[in-house]
């Protein structure tokens, strides 16, 4: 070891060793620091040890180190450790353990990590089809992201919540979520949110067109609604539904309405 290395703080030495690929040497230094209950660098060293051990293939050792860091309650490194645990459990498909680790992130309460934890919990709830819990967590990710400097995570949460709502026939609620997100989303997230908002409006339009037809409007209005509905549905990948709408109009018992629909159907022929 050179004289300059002897003067380097142990944490920096361990980092340099890890960057050079000497994971065993890095782990030895970090392990000593993490084992000192009174050491000022214990939390940071334990997180570093978790990363190094995971890179070495020692998953259980990495988790033990992460739990050591978490137990310190350090606002930065305990939160990092809980994230490390959660992401590892997710990779293995251990969703209950992952949920517990993400909740530990919330327990630490460090603002920079809270939106990420809410978003992860929302995704877990979505996969488990716990939709009320998912919505609650998505909204929490939006709120904490927007007000905690993590606007990108908040925008991602809004996009995923809106998609979930549209999947469950709630385009109006989805549109409200997206409009809220556009108030704080980073510039490069805005185009995607606007596309989603347009899709939500298409779904709303389809519902209004259908309601107009079912509401017994006059022949001209009903024919217009049928045409608009039939031409809009394919934009949402619903070509078969569009065909059924055309058939409904073309075969309608009201001859005046059917004639109006025929004119509109053959407009582009």
Give the role of each language-model region:
Residues 6-36, 48-55, 84-91:
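Alpha-helical segment of the N-proximal tetratricopeptide repeat
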Residues 23-24, 59, 95, 131, ...:
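TPR-repeat structural position
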Residues 31-35, 67-71, 103-107, 139-146, ...:
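Amphipathic alpha-helical segments of tetratricopeptide repeats
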